[in-house]
């Protein structure tokens, strides 16, 4: 059994963001604090559970949440690559982002335990342990010096726990197959669900109806499983090239009884996607947030050491600049210039240069790759991981090794050239991972691609790209 002393949570609150009404309860986010010892115990269980699920191929393949080697970026990369590939064929595509209300808090314990037993083979003592883990939990809310009475928790996976998110992933695994049965493509990251599909422009209304039927089926499944789809926050985005924008539907999509109007852009797991797939909104938001952080850092520049300032810039600015940049391959030059301006301003701040001073020597001294090479670096690393089986399973099949018999086909004992698929539009099809991965990989020398470990590959790759950016 799970020790009862580890089942009590202490709930505190923090303001969601500055400027919200402090008297409104909706302005606060509850934070669940659990025993540190209980989290250590949960880590051991998670390790055993994940090993069991992996060894028996039971993990949902298109669920990227809480899995090693998976991330929000790889999830969006897969979805956006599929959409770009469809648009490159001349089709139009639609992406629906589903939003759940308090998803982790409404999980039904009986349904979860039944699913663990029937769908994932968790039986006997292990099943009894999970039942003990989920039931008999309590929480106390603390606000300042005040404390509430003890409240029993009758549903939901434990917030703030290590095991809870994994259990939620297993609880919602059927959503993926439900979407696929509806003839559409799904992808999930925890409770963030993406449903998408494509069709010829003349069949857009049929695709819209298929999306509506599928999403309503998902909403019905959620209701029967004690989850609630938030139709007011569900978004629909139609994607096509600029010339086909006029062919996109403008009618609302009926979702759970509420009409959802198509939007011109959506924020998918922190990456903004526009209907024309040019990524203007994402670049604009990234540049705006990075410069806001730089303005704040400029105010404290004289109060910190150069090393501290560099650490802050890397943590608060470059992390934003690099997030999601695997989907920025093939950007129009003017958008790349805007992103590069952030990198240049960061280097000027650290090196105390004036606004119009040359930044080339500063970038070289900091050993920073330019934006274009940073994108190539990310693509190359994901390609290496895919070829060596440490990337998400849904990325590997997008790459194809050149079929050239004999040892002459090998660039080295472990590195083959990759085949880039033919594309119709260079500004669309060449931006998919299936095309960008081989293009970047085949441009690298054998000394880089033949690296035996990921760490060695990263080191050699950066050295190679740095030499290209700043030739001696």
Residue ranges and their predicted role:
Residues 7-12, 17-472:
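Hydrophobic/basic alpha-helical segments
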């Amino acid at each position: 059994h799970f020790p009862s002393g580890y089942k009590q949570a202490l709930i505190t609150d923090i303001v969601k963001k500055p400027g919200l009404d402090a008297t409104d309860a909706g302005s606060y986010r509850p934070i669940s604090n659990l025993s540190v010892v209980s989290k250590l115990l949960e880590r051991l269980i998670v390790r055993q559970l994940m090993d069991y699920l992996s060894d028996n191929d039971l993990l949902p393949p298109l669920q990227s949440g809480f899995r090693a080697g998976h991330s929000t970026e790889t999830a969006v990369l897969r979805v956006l690559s599929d959409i770009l590939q469809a648009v490159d064929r001349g089709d139009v595509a639609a992406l629906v982002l589903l939003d759940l209300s308090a998803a982790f808090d409404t999980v039904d314990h009986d349904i979860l335990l039944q699913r663990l037993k029937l769908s994932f083979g968790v039986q006997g003592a292990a099943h009894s342990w999970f039942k003990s883990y989920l039931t008999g939990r309590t929480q106390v809310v603390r606000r300042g010096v005040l404390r509430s009475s003890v409240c029993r928790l009758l549903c939901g996976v434990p917030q703030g726990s290590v095991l809870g998110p994994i259990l939620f992933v297993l609880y919602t695994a059927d959503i993926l197959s439900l979407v696929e049965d509806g003839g559409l493509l799904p992808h999930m990251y925890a409770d963030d669900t993406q449903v998408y599909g494509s069709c010829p422009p003349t069949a857009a209304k049929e695709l819209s109806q298929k999306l509506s039927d599928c999403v309503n089926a998902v909403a019905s499944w959620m209701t029967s499983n004690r989850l609630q789809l938030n139709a007011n926050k569900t978004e629909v985005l139609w994607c096509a090239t600029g010339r086909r924008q006029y062919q996109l539907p403008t009618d609302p999509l009926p979702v759970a009884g509420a009409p959802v109007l198509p939007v011109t852009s959506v924020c998918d797991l922190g990456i903004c996607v526009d209907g024309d797939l040019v990524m203007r909104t994402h670049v604009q938001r990234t540049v705006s947030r990075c410069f806001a952080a730089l303005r704040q850092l400029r105010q404290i520049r004289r109060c910190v050491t150069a090393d501290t300032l560099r650490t802050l810039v890397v943590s608060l600015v470059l992390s934003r600049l690099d997030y999601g940049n695997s989907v920025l391959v093939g950007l129009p030059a003017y958008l790349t210039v805007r992103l590069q301006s952030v990198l240049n301003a960061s280097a000027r701040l650290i090196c105390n240069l004036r606004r119009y001073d040359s930044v080339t020597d500063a970038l070289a001294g900091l050993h920073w790759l330019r934006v274009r090479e940073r994108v190539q670096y990310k693509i190359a690393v994901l390609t290496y991981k895919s070829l060596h089986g440490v990337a998400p399973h849904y990325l590997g099949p997008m790459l194809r090794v050149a079929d050239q018999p004999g040892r002459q086909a090998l660039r080295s004992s472990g590195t083959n050239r990759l085949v880039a698929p033919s594309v119709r539009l260079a500004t669309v099809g060449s931006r998919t991972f299936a095309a960008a991965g081989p293009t970047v990989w085949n441009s690298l020398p054998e000394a880089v691609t033949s690296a035996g470990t990921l760490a060695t590959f990263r080191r050699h790759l950066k050295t190679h790209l740095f030499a290209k950016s700043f030739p001696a």
